[in-house]
Swiss-Prot record:
Catalysed conversion reaction: RNA(n) + a ribonucleoside 5'-triphosphate = RNA(n+1) + diphosphate
Lineage of origin: Eukaryota, Viridiplantae, Streptophyta, Embryophyta, Tracheophyta
Subunit details: In plastids the minimal PEP RNA polymerase catalytic core is composed of four subunits: alpha, beta, beta', and beta''. When a (nuclear-encoded) sigma factor is associated with the core the holoenzyme is formed, which can initiate transcription.
Protein EC: 2.7.7.6
Cystine crosslinks: none
Residues binding Zn(2+), per UniProt: C224, C295, C302, C305
Name of the protein in its database record: DNA-directed RNA polymerase subunit beta''
Organism: Solanum bulbocastanum
PANTHER family to which the protein is assigned, alphabetical: DNA-DIRECTED RNA POLYMERASE SUBUNIT BETA (PTHR34995:SF1)
CDD domains: RNAP_beta'_C (cd02655)
Leading EC class: transferase
Gene: rpoC2
Entry-linked HAMAP family: RNApol_bact_RpoC2
Cofactors named for this entry: Zn(2+)
Role summary: DNA-dependent RNA polymerase catalyzes the transcription of DNA into RNA using the four ribonucleoside triphosphates as substrates.
């Protein structure tokens, strides 16, 4: 007893947690020391103890134990703030989509990680025995990441493609998820459940395939006598000691090992723990060990190459079925990998940088000499510290020291004030994540319809020379100019000369948007094109009047187009049939006392004037009323005044019939107050009663005037009128017309009445009969209007063209807008115009121009000497269709007859073509081409672009622009007037009241204008600008007649920006046409930030910007689509190729192993491998001479690829904490790399090209025949390797039975039944097992011996020589080089 006690006293007491691996070690030690029986007894006791303790503890888990981390709120807020800034940068085009995705992922990942690290300290302080806390690190159930999801935040999730969803789940499972978060996380969670089920079967199948490959490998000899080995080096700390010792224990040395001159281990000696420790301490030279790779036997393995048997701890027995053991050892942990797969449920974990946060508020100090400035990978400035850096933060009373590890980035400056928990440094992610990089393509889709432009040169990808895939050479912006495309399948007929006017019928097509004017009547369309236009010259104009076209003639106040070619010859260029009216500028108009109500020049929808059309009109404010009333024309006789009905609307053009030429000198307006009420409303006054001013009529209406009330009930509404005036009850004798009222001129009196009065003004007498018997007379006041020719419209236009001799006349006509006795209803607060003064256009018919049925009008804006003048241009032309008839061009006519110029009038009005040279101006991003569509025989799909309302913004005018008071007021009320109100389409001005205000383009200071014009190099601008004209169609869209790409701009699509008059003096940027402007760029001082877009019009004090969205793209990105192409929303715009770290979830587990074993290509070869091979091929042959260098190179390549395969597989298992001995994996890898493919170059007599043969067999055959056999080493997947074995029975029992057996029969293959499976199938004795060698007949052995020795000696001798020769050379040349540089991984196991 005493002895025992004393022994016990000497024992060391270990107080340590024991996990699985420690337990394994303990058991193996116990077996070594005490044997099996004793060990099992000890383990029993341990088990009993464990169960007792577990019963006593009884941990329970309740929902109250899930405590959210307090710092979560502000952390999430912080991250959201950063994301917001990022979003803004992306919007301005400073950051491209991939950067944005990456940064937002990093922001959220860092937040989530920081929360996870806070979790344990938080629990430790508040509740150390919290079951959730204990669960997170005990390893019994769950891990830190799962607990983090319960109490921290769920974080980023992967989507089904393995991509990151950049919307993080901010809640944890305790708080509960919102609907969106729930849907995002569903995928990962479900995948976890499904995967567990699917992967179990996967793992089983993997085991089956592995066993299939290696089932025939059995230990058959003691020593194959190989001299090769694989060197493993413990030096330089390349390999961790744990892995180093694992690799070595149980192996056999291939060479003696010397320590100086002393030999510490001999060849063929098994390595135990003692020897390994000695190697580690001595840091000896690289140790060469034998592995299954180096074994020389073809279809089995020798004891020494295999090493120790893991079960007994001594060399493996002969006859051991090591192949099957290897297959099962690799396959079995697969099930564990499966079960651990998706507990984290698709949560993203990647290696991003960790953050260091300041512990408190204070001033930060560090040694500036130890850091040097750099930028983070997101381009933010930072300091890089190369060694450990101590940072002190001085708060009020205490100093905090923070240690920042080397290779970290400091994000703050010295002496800067930091707030508590502010990020002050980033610690670089560990290197381990570098393996999980993969290349990903990210497509960027366009957010809106529009036209694509880019601001740099673009390469065509070589394979798509004629396609639309382009590579960007440098970082640049892609712009999508907003505007909806509208495809049309017509080929446009470009048979127009420069500056010709052209009817837009030929430019039409079926829109994607249903426009309310498309003609869908096919018969009418066929009728239109039935006559053959091109056969003979004919001037016939097809009659459109029978087309059921819907015409709405909106009136357009002055339509002007932005810029014509800047040739001032246009002033002098008066051709026949064309005349140009210069419009006066504002100053000239201000001198005359013309009221600013404005003259509207009305150009009809399609720009065509018939004879007697109204060209312009002027609404005289004197004839304007606010209230409702009735119009009466003078006396009953003067009825032949021109009324509105007599204007004939012909194809949308108002024109006068000349027969109504009579003039009226006066008309009368009888005011009355009218309220139109819904039928259900309750009225508080009776019919025929008399009310005073401001009487309550209905609940919310009061009368504005006093007088007689008349109530008329119609079907669905009530019309309530209040007539002001006097009421007379006349005697019987008064003869007042029963039906209508009578106008009484001044000076007449009621003769029969008792009191005889003179009437001073005109009055209107109306008889009212409230009941059958009685009636009374209402005498109502009348407003009299005289019509004079006082205001002459001619003052707007210079008198010159009115006396023009080229047969165009303008006449001035006044007409009354309302008919005699017509009641006029004014909507509240709008004024009613009673008389309109019109300018009527007419022209003479002379014999020559008999076909001039119509005139075209358009506005031209021309700058001369810095003044912008607007001209109205009117040309007398013939119909465009008769033009087409004049050109007897077969190809043109062919196109016409096929699908004609389909009359789907999307934009029924005339376009003016201005061609320029076909040269793309890269600087202005405005491609222009002379369009000869006639060369284009095949009908291509042309497209129109329709810009929609929301696409434009405008900069408000500045206060110093002389602006009309109306606009000023409206600006005060609402700074963003809808553009439609204040600015009609580009082309129409502001509404009539403030007609001139937007014409304030001629500055009062002529000098500045010229200065501006010099700056903005005008000549060039005029040649290049593409949008020559804007014309309107009836939807208020602006049509830009560009022959190849028709853009229909909506008024709102443009951003007007008004600049100061003296804007050149102030602004730093000179704005040029076509320039792209990003958002937030100020053009004028104190100008509001603009939307991003392209400048399409520069006036003297304003610019118009077409909205555009910038997308930043980096070099190497692929751009889809051509320059200037129309894109739809959702089209792919750019494809970025970028590397991302794979989500480090154990999605890798089994599939990764399978990927390696089945040799599926994973990703592109790493660059440094190629470089290594190149450098190897350069230097080695130089040292060894050519044949040897390449020979060794080839051998090393095979060895190296095998080693890297083993490392890859080990990595997956180790990452899961599964220990598998290398030799099991090596046996399998040996099988999949042992075949070679005979290549065709060296045709040999033995093998046919394309045959798969064992590597060793090929080498031996080559030596025996003394003839070179050319072959290539191939890597077979395990499935292919199973189907390429020596035995066809084994193959047939694996897959494709019928095919394999049929082929074998045809080829006459012989199965030598060497493996296990063949014998099992045929029911023979299995040729394995440790007692197997007794079965071999002794006499056979004797016979074989002499022969065998001869052979082996012969081969061995030769081979030894070669190999030793290699070896010595190799060692002498390379040992110095290879093992001092980290190219170590060439030879030796490396945990890469």
């Amino acid at each position: 007893m005493e002895v025992l006690m004393a022994e016990r006293a000497n024992l060391v007491f270990h107080n340590k947690a024991i996990d699985g691996t420690a337990m394994k070690r303990l058991i193996s030690r116990l077996i070594e020391h005490f044997g099996m029986a004793y060990t099992s007894h000890i383990l029993d006791q341990v088990k009993t103890l464990g169960f007792q303790q577990a019963t006593a503890t009884s941990i329970s888990l309740g929902i109250d134990d899930l405590l959210t981390i307090p710092s979560k709120g502000w952390l999430v807020q912080d991250a959201e703030q950063q994301s917001l800034i990022l979003e803004k940068h992306h919007h301005y085009g400073n950051v491209h989509a991939v950067e944005k995705l990456r940064q937002s992922i990093e922001i959220w990942y860092a937040t989530s990680e920081y929360l996870r690290q806070e979790m344990n300290p938080n629990f430790r302080m508040t509740d150390p025995f919290n079951p959730v806390h204990i669960m997170s690190f005990s390893g019994a159930r769950g891990n830190a990441s799962q607990v983090h999801q319960l109490v921290g935040m769920r974080g980023l999730m992967s989507d089904p493609q393995g991509q990151m969803i950049d919307l993080p789940i901010q809640s944890n499972l305790r708080e509960g998820l919102s609907l969106t978060e729930y849907i995002i996380s569903c995928y990962g969670a479900r995948k976890g459940v499904v995967d567990t089920a699917v992967r179990t079967s996967d793992a089983g199948y993997l085991t089956r395939r592995l066993v299939e490959v290696v089932q025939h490998i059995v230990v058959r000899r003691t020593d194959c006598g190989t001299a090769r080995g694989i060197s493993v080096s413990p030096r330089n700390g390349i390999m961790p000691e744990r892995i180093f010792s694992q690799t070595l224990i149980g192996r056999v040395l291939a060479d003696d090992i010397y320590m100086g001159s002393r030999c510490i281990a001999t060849r063929n000696q098994a390595i135990g723990i003692g020897l390994v420790n000695r190697f580690i301490t001595f840091r000896a030279q690289p140790i060469s060990i034998r592995t299954p790779f180096t074994c020389r036997s073809t279809s089995w393995i020798c004891r020494l190459c295999y090493g120790r048997s893991p079960t007994h701890g001594d060399l493996v027995e002969l006859g051991e079925a090591v192949g099957i053991i290897a297959g099962q050892s690799i396959g079995e942990p697969g099930t564990q990998l499966t079960l651990r797969t998706f507990h984290t449920g698709g949560v993203f974990t990647g290696g991003t940088a960790e953050h260091v946060r300041a512990p408190s508020n204070g001033k930060i100090k560090f040694n500036e000499d130890l850091v040097h400035p750099t930028r983070t990978r997101h381009g933010h400035p930072a300091f890089l510290c190369s060694i450990d850096l101590y940072v002190t933060i001085e708060s009020e009373d205490i100093l905090h020291n923070v240690n920042i590890p080397p290779k970290s980035l400091l994000l703050v400056q010295n002496d800067q004030y930091v707030e508590s928990e502010q990020v002050i440094a980033e610690i670089r992610a560990g290197i381990s994540t570098l393996n999980f990089k993969e290349k990903v393509r990210k497509h960027i889709y366009s957010d809106s319809d529009g036209e694509m432009h880019w601001s740099t040169d673009v390469y065509h990808a070589p394979e798509f020379t004629y396609g639309n895939v382009h590579l960007l050479p440098k970082t640049s912006h892609l712009w999508i100019l907003l505007g909806g495309p509208c495809r049309s399948s017509l080929v446009y007929l470009s048979i127009h000369k420069d500056q010709d006017q052209m009817n837009a019928h030929s430019l039409s097509g079926k829109p994607r948007y249903t426009s309310n004017l498309s003609v869908t009547n096919d018969q009418a369309r066929q009728k239109l094109f039935s006559s053959d236009f091109y056969g003979q010259k004919e001037d016939r104009i097809p009659d459109y009047s029978d087309l059921n076209r819907i015409i709405c003639t909106g009136q357009y106040n002055l339509v002007y187009s932005p810029i014509l070619h800047g040739n001032s010859d246009l002033l002098s260029k008066r051709r026949r049939n064309k005349f140009i009216i210069p419009l006066h500028s504002i100053q000239e108009l201000e001198n005359e006392l013309m009221p600013c109500s404005g003259i509207s020049i009305e150009i009809p929808v399609n720009g065509i004037f018939r004879r007697n059309s109204i060209l312009a009109y002027f609404d005289d404010p004197r004839y304007r009323r606010k209230s409702s009333g009735i119009i009466k024309y003078g006396t009953i006789e003067t009825h032949s005044v021109i009324k509105k009905e007599d204007l004939i609307e012909y194809r949308g053009v108002k024109e006068f019939r000349p027969k109504y030429q009579m003039k009226v000198d006066r008309f009368f307006f009888i005011p009355e107050e009218v309220h139109i009420l819904p039928g259900s409303s309750s009225i508080m006054v009776r019919n025929n009663s008399i009310v005073g001013v401001d009487t309550q009529i209905t609940l919310n209406l009061r009368s504005r005037v006093g007088g007689l009330v008349r109530v008329e009930r119609k079907k669905k509404r009530i019309e309530l009128k209040i007539f002001s005036g006097d009421i007379h009850f006349p005697g019987e004798t008064d003869k007042i017309s029963r039906h209508t009222g009578v106008l009484i001129p001044p000076g007449t009196g009621k003769r029969n009445s008792k009191e005889y009065k003179k009437v001073k003004n005109w009055i209107y007498v109306q008889r009212i009969t409230p009941s059958k018997k009685r009636f009374f007379v209402l005498v109502r006041p009348v407003v009299t209007y005289e019509i004079t020719d006082g205001i002459n419209l001619g003052t707007l236009f210079p008198p010159d063209p009115l006396q023009e001799r080229d047969n165009v006349q303008l006449r001035i006509v006044n007409y009354i807008l309302y008919g005699n006795g017509k009641p006029i209803r004014g909507i509240s607060d709008t004024s009613i115009q009673l008389v309109r003064t019109c300018l009527v256009l007419n022209w003479n018919q002379d014999k020559k121009s008999s076909s001039c049925e119509e005139a075209r009008a358009s506005f031209v804006e021309i700058r001369t000497n810095g003044l912008i003048r607007h001209f109205l241009r009117i040309n007398l032309v013939k119909s465009p269709i008769s033009y087409i008839g004049k050109r007897n061009d077969p190809s043109g006519s062919g196109l016409l007859s096929d699908n004609g110029s389909d009359c789907t009038n999307i934009n029924p009005f005339s376009a003016i073509y201005s061609y320029s040279k076909a040269k793309i101006q890269q600087s202005l991003n405005q491609p222009q081409g002379t369009i000869h569509t006639l060369l284009n025989r095949n009908k291509e799909c042309q497209s129109l672009i329709i810009l929609s309302a929301a696409n434009c913004s405008r900069m408000e005018p500045f206060k110093d622009v002389k602006y009309h008071s109306v606009i000023k007021e409206s600006i005060k009320k609402d700074p963003l007037i809808p553009i439609r109100n204040s600015l009609g389409p580009l082309g129409t001005c502001l509404p009539i009241e403030n007609f001139y205000s937007s014409y304030h383009l001629i500055t009062h200071n002529q000098i500045l204008v010229t200065k501006y014009l010099q700056l903005d190099n005008l000549k060039q601008t005029f040649q290049v600008i593409k949008l020559k004209y804007y014309l309107m169609d009836e939807n208020g869209k602006i049509f830009n007649p560009d022959p190849c790409r028709n853009i229909i701009l909506n008024p709102f699509n443009l951003n007007w920006s008004f600049l100061h008059h003296n804007y050149c003096a102030e602004t730093s940027k000179i704005i040029s046409l076509g320039q792209f402007i990003c958002e937030n760029v100020c053009i004028a001082k104190n100008g509001p930030p603009l939307k991003s877009g392209q400048v399409i019009l520069v006036q003297v004090d304003s610019i118009v910007i077409r909205s555009a969205k910038p997308y930043l793209a980096t070099p190497g990105a692929t751009v889809h689509g051509h320059y200037g192409e129309t894109l739809y929303e959702g089209d792919t715009l750019v494809t970025f190729i970028y590397e991302k770290s794979r989500s480090g979830d154990i999605t890798q587990g089994l599939p990764k192993v399978e990927q390696v074993l089945e040799v599926r290509s994973i990703d592109s070869i790493s660059m440094n491998l190629e470089k290594r091979v190149e450098s190897w091929n350069k230097c080695i042959p130089r040292i060894l001479g050519i044949p040897w260098g390449f020979l060794i190179g080839a051998e090393l390549t095979i060895a190296q690829s095998r080693i890297s395969l083993v490392n890859k597989i080990q990595q997956v298992y180790r990452s899961q904490g599964v220990q598998i001995h290398n030799r099991h994996i090596e046996i399998i890898v040996r099988q999949i790399t042992s075949k070679v493919l005979i290549s065709e170059d060296g045709m040999s007599n033995v093998f046919s090209p394309g045959e798969l043969i064992g590597l060793l067999r090929a080498e031996r055959m080559g030596r025996a025949l003394e003839e070179a056999i050319c072959y290539r080493v191939v890597l077979l997947g395990i499935t292919r390797a199973s189907l390429n074995t020596q035995s066809f029975i084994s193959e047939a029992s694996f897959q494709e039975t019928a095919r394999v057996l049929a082929k074998a029969a045809l080829r006459g293959r012989i199965d030598w039944l060497k493996g296990l499976k063949e014998n099992v199938v045929l029911g023979g004795v299995i040729p394995v097992g440790t007692g197997f060698k007794g079965l071999v007949h002794p006499s056979k052995q004797h016979n074989n011996i002499p022969l065998e020795t001869k052979k082996t000696n012969l081969f061995e001798g030769e081979m030894r020589d070669i190999l030793f020769h290699h070896r010595k050379l190799f060692d002498s040349c390379l040992s110095k080089k290879f093992h001092d540089i980290p190219e170590q991984s060439f030879i030796g196991f490396n945990d890469s």
